[in-house]
From Swiss-Prot:
Transmembrane segments: none annotated. PROSITE patterns: THAUMATIN_1, THAUMATIN_2. It comes from the Eukaryota. Belongs to the thaumatin family. Residues 1-20 form the signal peptide. PANTHER family: OS03G0233200 PROTEIN. It comes from Arabidopsis thaliana (Mouse-ear cress). Pfam families: Thaumatin. This is Thaumatin-like protein. Keywords: Disulfide bond, Signal. Disulfide bonds join C29-C238, C77-C87, C92-C98, C144-C228, C149-C211, C157-C174, C178-C187, C188-C198.
């Protein structure tokens, strides 16, 4: 994993013909972000599961063939020299290197599954929102569309879903309705555990209008999941515009 200029790296990606996929984590936020990486069951742990990414910096990471997992951004983090500390959002057990642990909701997620012929990827708000985030394929074949949430949902988050800073002055994250109310209707569980009975709610519709290219609830598949073949990927925190 190396810190590099994004535009140089994008050029290198276009020249790459390697069979393995590469992902760039690019931080366009005005503050540091600590990316978290959680592999799916049975998959390799990458980069210890987390690292610091300063503002306007990029890091590259090679994904093993057929790898699957999720990425998210932590912010407001402080860690000591041993890598122990805490993040205001997306914390993974108080560790710089998440070591396979997931992020504490609410957190925006980018999910990817590399297939032998076709990759599947998405950005999900099912576990809530903390940072604007996108995932975009580079040099792939097929539909290869953009997935992400550019809008700042913290600015439009309903009061019942808000997570505020310690001093209470600002909203730092926005819970999903499932996390906030723990209801089968919002969580798509029990009698609502299928696409026919679990429909968009007033809360998920707020997310969907603001971020039409992201999952707003568990069965939001048709407009949210993207596919591409033999691509590399750029995961951007705080993207300024849709691609």
């Amino acid at each position: 994993m190396a810190s590099i200029n994004l535009f140089l790296f994008a050029f290198l990606l276009l020249l790459s013909h390697a069979s393995a996929s590469t992902v760039i984590f690019y931080n366009k936020c005005k503050h540091p972000v600590w990316p978290g990486i959680q592999p799916s069951a049975g998959q390799n742990l990458l980069a210890g599961g987390g690292f610091k990414l300063p503002a306007n910096k990029a890091h590259s990471l090679q994904l093993p063939p057929l790898w699957s997992g999720r990425f998210w951004g932590r912010h407001g983090c402080t860690f000591d020299r041993s890598g122990r500390g805490h993040c205001a959002t997306g914390d993974c057990g108080g560790s710089l290197s998440c070591n396979g642990a997931g992020g504490e909701p609410p957190a925006t997620l980018a999910e990817i599954t590399l297939g032998p012929e076709l990759d599947f990827y998405d950005v999900s708000l099912v576990d809530g929102y903390n940072l604007a985030m996108s995932i975009m394929p580079v040099k792939g074949s097929g539909q290869c569309s953009y997935a992400g949430c550019v809008s700042d949902l913290n600015q439009m988050c309903p009061v019942g879903l808000q997570v505020r800073s310690r001093n209470g002055k600002r909203v730092v994250a926005c819970k999903s309705a499932c996390s906030a109310f723990n209801s089968p209707q919002y969580c798509c569980t029990g009698l609502f555990g299928n696409p026919q009975s679990c429909k968009p709610t007033a809360y998920s519709k707020i997310f969907k209008v603001a971020c039409p290219k992201a999952y707003s609830y568990a069965y939001d598949d048709p407009t949210s999941i993207a596919t591409c073949s033999k691509a590399n990927y750029i995961v951007t925190f705080c993207p300024h515009h849709r691609h």
